[in-house]
């Protein structure tokens, strides 16, 4: 029969092999900050260049900078809205 010392050694060996073979699960709170930083800088660069292209293309025009359409009737002289329009057109 096996002595208690041999059984103890076999149990210790089995426990050490069982703990060594257990797959290590990745820690869900460990983040790759380098990749996150590079991705953020890339997106920021693309949006910056897109903004510059939109500004330089002159297709984005402000509504109040456009001339009044010729088909619209002139508004009355005494209304509040017409006085605001007259004041805004004097700045040009």
From Swiss-Prot:
GO molecular function: ATPase binding; myosin binding; sodium channel regulator activity
Modified residues (Phosphothreonine): 79, 89
In-chain residues carrying the UniProt-annotated modification Phosphoserine: 82-83, 88
Topological domains, Cytoplasmic: 57-92
Gene: Fxyd1
Record-level GO cellular component terms: apical plasma membrane; caveola; intercalated disc; sarcolemma; sodium:potassium-exchanging ATPase complex; T-tubule
Chain positions found as S-glutathionyl cysteine: 62
Name listed for the protein in its UniProt record: Phospholemman
Organism: Rattus norvegicus
A Pfam family this chain is assigned to: ATP1G1_PLM_MAT8
